[in-house]
Swiss-Prot record:
The keyword Metal-binding does not apply. Keywords: Aminotransferase, Cytoplasm, Glutamine amidotransferase, Repeat, Transferase. This is Glutamine--fructose-6-phosphate aminotransferase [isomerizing]. Residues 284-423, 456-594 form the SIS domain. Its EC number is 2.6.1.16. The lineage of its organism: Bacteria, Bacillati, Bacillota, Bacilli, Lactobacillales. It comes from Streptococcus pyogenes serotype M1. PROSITE patterns: GATASE_TYPE_2, SIS.
Amino acid sequence: MCGIVGVVGNRNATDILMQGLEKLEYRGYDSAGIFVANANQTNLIKSVGRIADLRAKIGIDVAGSTGIGHTRWATHGQSTEDNAHPHTSQTGRFVLVHNGVIENYLHIKTEFLAGHDFKGQTDTEIAVHLIGKFVEEDKLSVLEAFKKSLSIIEGSYAFALMDSQATDTIYVAKNKSPLLIGLGEGYNMVCSDAMAMIRETSEFMEIHDKELVILTKDKVTVTDYDGKELIRDSYTAELDLSDIGKGTYPFYMLKEIDEQPTVMRQLISTYADETGNVQVDPAIITSIQEADRLYILAAGTSYHAGFATKNMLEQLTDTPVELGVASEWGYHMPLLSKKPMFILLSQSGETADSRQVLVKANAMGIPSLTVTNVPGSTLSREATYTMLIHAGPEIAVASTKAYTAQIAALAFLAKAVGEANGKQEALDFNLVHELSLVAQSIEATLSEKDLVAEKVQALLATTRNAFYIGRGNDYYVAMEAALKLKEISYIQCEGFAAGELKHGTISLIEEDTPVIALISSSQLVASHTRGNIQEVAARGAHVLTVVEEGLDREGDDIIVNKVHPFLAPIAMVIPTQLIAYYASLQRGLDVDKPRNLAKAVTVE
């Protein structure tokens, strides 16, 4: 959700900014802009639309060694060039890019900026005018003006500030919004995440909330808001350029769907030794053993992954599990058990809603585990423990491999705790073998892409509405499948417990309504779900079945290899990912960048 990139030093700033913004496209945006400066000139260029639209406006004379760039996802004000970043102060001297939400921007505007002229309607423009006022009207130094502004501003922010009269410095600050420093020889960078800087550096420095950074080409100075200098160690990122390219794929989403067998095998090599023994941090196991209830907090796809693992976690750990929507728990935390433990699922590790819950958990002394794809992310730093899902960069906005990797990672956790408790079911659960079979099942499904595309064309070519139904874990997969179809095909789709159809939803079924039924786990589940299929078919529904091998009948549409019931959500979700992909593709939509959506939701 928005992206920042900046560079100061001995590099071509325009090229670096544009390449960086392209790497940040996956975060979601509706406009973009750059500010580039050298000793002789400055250039501010903004555009509504894609990065390609911005690139088309940049002339060959736009050059410099220092600059800041931004992709904007509208929160205050519509998507216009005036509202696009970077924003300038009243005189144009100061230039600012910002991710986050300034909560008291109206108070700042009326209290400090009477008589100022504003070009747009953003909270960011208020912030840069405030900085400019303190320098040009109140005669503070740039650094003191920045600090004073930060003491007034309330909310979440990641700021990168430049002074057009001293273009050899970038001022940076953050609070509740992700930001990284990239380190180079003769240049330094700032960015929302490492993805945008990986072509230029693999050395990074984390900055924490309410810290201020001064970047020059040769030095990075980190202080708190009182000016006390802080020592920050750097680290080397494990990203590879080949991981963030599409290769021969038309869309990242298809590439990431295809990578899931590899991800399963990577998790095996990470969380099991050569003899198949599960290896999970003993401190995490002990913490779960000491808890009397586990609370899984997440949003979107990660929330659905939590549901898909609930039954497995309870059966193998003998600990009750509750699911919570992070955005709701941030405002109203329900009555908790006496010894709770929180598990936060987040692909990016930056989800603002989940972080809000984590801050409360930390204040209450509740132990927490973050399960994430991004080492060094905010949630991984602030939680008590972290498990990485090792899915590799996920660029497409619609999550696929992170969902299946979260389920697999939690399977290792559940088995490890169960074994530590001496639970026979956990001891008998040969996870390495079973997950290897899951990888094979995924590969078998992926070999049937043409069949799925054909089924989608017949089922979803013109529809505006669709339904997924299932029972047990299939219901949880149905919720994720419906979200995926909504996200990238814009088909209104809902996932329902099949047994709930007769309690209201069946009134929506009419001639040719698409209903996709998921069937796995047991003959009992299959029998009852097929009864529901007959109910909707009798009302004219166009039914497509996704059925686990051994439960299939003649006439079923997509057959999925049988896997262990705990891991069935992984195998069963793969056809639904392909269904969403082909539905979007056949409608001529941008599969990787659906409208109005962001990959990492970093504001509440």
